[in-house]
Amino acid sequence: MDYKETAKRLIELLGGKENIISAAHCATRLRLVMKDESKIDQAQVEELDGVKGAFSSSGQYQIIFGTGLVNKVFDAFSKEADIEREEHVNHQDAAKEKLNPAARFAKTLSNIFVPIIPAIVASGLLMGLLGMINAFHWMSKDSALLQLLDMFSSAAFIFLPILIGVSASKEFGSNPYLGAVIGGIMIHPNLLNPWGLAEATPDYMHLFGFDIALLGYQGTVIPVLLAVYVMSKVEKWTRKVVPHAVDLLVTPFVTVIVTGFVAFIAIGPLGRALGSGITVALTYVYDHAGFVAGLIFGGTYSLIVLTGVHHSFHAIEAGLIADIGKNYLLPIWSMANVAQGGAGLAVFFMAKKAKTKEIALPAAFSAFLGITEPVIFGVNLRYRKPFIAAMIGGALGGAYVVFTHVAANAYGLTGIPMIAIAAPFGFSNLIHYLIGMAIAAVSAFIAAFVMKINEDEERKK
């Protein structure tokens, strides 16, 4: 594949360089913010060598190339389109300008939590390894290696406010190191750590007529999000009114001291209550709606993926882990993803065209590994009926994992990789997860076969 020629041809089909505002890429997709999407030749873009699908979502025109390939295409594309790498930082802002307030809020949460996923995944996998070591008695509990693994596995969750502080500061346009400081203040060693001391009673201090609990915010999400948002406003306002000559001295000082007081007096307790309220509400629905909740969430999750809003769920999942120590939403999302793979596999066996088969098989296996965009946009949504079949499979699998109370100890992994973060909750939890995967994939496969596909009738552009 000639990446340079592909990039040149792609630019032509997109309406020329002048129609491209900014470009970036994720693990599988080239993400573009366009001036006028009506100038794009959608049909020809999808026929381009290496393209597995193209669609418009979340204020961006997204072209699926797949893992590895997208990096090489992007390098050639950015050169041919005269897009400087420095402009990539502004890509998210350019995309968000085209969204409505609700979508913009979801996009903001996504931008904050997606960069943190590797840290959470690493901790979750380490917890899985730790759980297996304890379950099978591979090491003595007094082993130095076991104690180190325990520290490694809990670090990301204990210091989560610092990670969020850095990421949220970047998203809100403030200094990420000040964000890290605010996150650090909220988990200071002088504060009682609720992560490991859930039953302990914190001391109180009296300040400005308020009783402030000396309780840390380790593992919390909403308190630090709100605190860093306020910090960004304080920093920007201070920078506007402070003379440039003393900006470096005054702005950080005012920002940290004002945000710190506000965080402990108001934002922290409010954020903790809000986060606990969300957890209680979700747990109530989970406990009382039972498998019906799994049926609905599992069936509709793929529709949510189409909007890009699904990344904002990471904030809720992180809150669940902090509050109750487990994530019962992720297994439901995983069923929806696996079902997309099952439907995509059915398309591979039903398809007559070589290009369809060429796209469907790797895209289906990608979904089994947790990356669904190629199979959703490149295969199932293109022929519509397989997408509906996947929704059916996701609903059935989701109902099963809720009925059997399957949970995970992290977020960000679905499909086969999620086995590692489901295992720590015991053999039964793991077996039910595998059964749920089988139900989702097989039912989606069968439903897609029953519905059939017409390769000459693709989704409407």
Swiss-Prot record:
Any single Gene Ontology cellular-component annotation: plasma membrane
Induction, as annotated: Induced by sucrose. Expression is regulated by the antiterminator SacT.
Matches recorded under InterPro entries: Glu_permease_IIB, PTrfase_EIIB_Cys, PTS_EIIC, PTS_EIIC_1, PTS_IIB_1, PTS_IIBC_sucr, PTS_maltose/Glc_sub_IIC, PTS_Sugar-Specific_Components
The keyword Transit peptide belongs to this UniProt entry's keyword annotation: no
Keywords, comma-separated and alphabetical: Cell membrane, Kinase, Membrane, Phosphotransferase system, Sugar transport, Transferase, Transmembrane, Transmembrane helix, Transport
Coiled coil spans: none
Residue intervals of the PTS EIIB type-1 domain: 4-87
Top EC class, one word: transferase
GO molecular function: kinase activity; protein-N(PI)-phosphohistidine-sucrose phosphotransferase system transporter activity; protein-phosphocysteine-trehalose phosphotransferase system transporter activity
Keyword Transport included in the entry's annotation: yes
EC number(s) per entry: 2.7.1.211
TM annotation in the entry: 112-132, 148-168, 178-198, 208-228, 248-268, 289-309, 329-349, 359-379, 387-407, 430-450
One BP term from GO: trehalose transport
SUPFAM superfamilies per the UniProt record, alphabetical: Glucose permease domain IIB
Subcellular location: Cell membrane
List of catalytic residues: 26 (phosphocysteine intermediate)
PROSITE patterns linked to this entry: PTS_EIIB_TYPE_1, PTS_EIIB_TYPE_1_CYS, PTS_EIIC_TYPE_1
PANTHER family referenced in this protein's UniProt entry, alphabetically: NEGATIVE REGULATOR OF SACY ACTIVITY, PHOSPHOTRANSFERASE SYSTEM TRANSPORT PROTEIN
Function summary: The phosphoenolpyruvate-dependent sugar phosphotransferase system (sugar PTS), a major carbohydrate active transport system, catalyzes the phosphorylation of incoming sugar substrates concomitantly with their translocation across the cell membrane. This system is involved in sucrose transport.
Domain notes: The PTS EIIB type-1 domain is phosphorylated by phospho-EIIA on a cysteinyl residue. Then, it transfers the phosphoryl group to the sugar substrate concomitantly with the sugar uptake processed by the PTS EIIC type-1 domain. The EIIC domain type-1 forms the PTS system translocation channel and contains the specific substrate-binding site.
Protein name per its UniProtKB record: PTS system sucrose-specific EIIBC component
Organism, as annotated: Bacillus subtilis (strain 168)
Gene (name only): sacP
